[in-house]
């Protein structure tokens, strides 16, 4: 039987990151609508595609959770939907925080607590999040 995550910091980190990925998905869906209304079809499509990828990230995290109630304390962007330019900046900043700070830290904690599969998941998703940031920055620099 696999080691339980119940009561660990890894369990809290999984729920925190699941919530973050879920919220990012919704923000990107909103941002896609703004981009489309502003005439940026390609950017709208990228926001939509990235939203779908964030959904898959959230699903990978959710599958490691074991049920029950888990209390977390976390800070999340409290929702301004701006112009496409502002939304690209906000999205790039969020992705940067995930791949450069949050997920490497969560991977290290998972490793220390004896959850190598969860650590690997965070490291793999970090690579994707870096790609998301780079894509958003490419639009900003165009």
Model features per residue range: what roles?
Residues 1-142:
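Non-heme di-metal
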């Amino acid at each position: 039987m696999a080691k339980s995550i119940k009561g660990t910091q890894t369990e809290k980190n999984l729920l925190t990151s699941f919530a973050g990925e879920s919220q990012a998905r919704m923000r990107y869906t909103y941002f896609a609508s703004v981009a489309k209304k502003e005439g940026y079809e390609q950017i709208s499509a990228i926001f939509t595609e990235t939203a779908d990828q964030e959904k898959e990230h959230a699903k990978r995290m959710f599958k490691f959770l074991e049920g029950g109630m888990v209390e977390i304390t976390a800070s999340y962007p409290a929702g301004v939907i701006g112009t496409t330019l502002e939304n690209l900046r906000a999205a790039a900043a969020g992705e940067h925080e995930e791949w450069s700070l949050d997920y490497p830290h969560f991977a290290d904690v998972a490793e220390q607590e004896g959850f190598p599969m969860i650590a690997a998941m965070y490291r793999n998703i970090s690579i994707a999040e870096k790609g998301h940031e780079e894509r958003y920055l490419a639009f900003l620099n165009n």
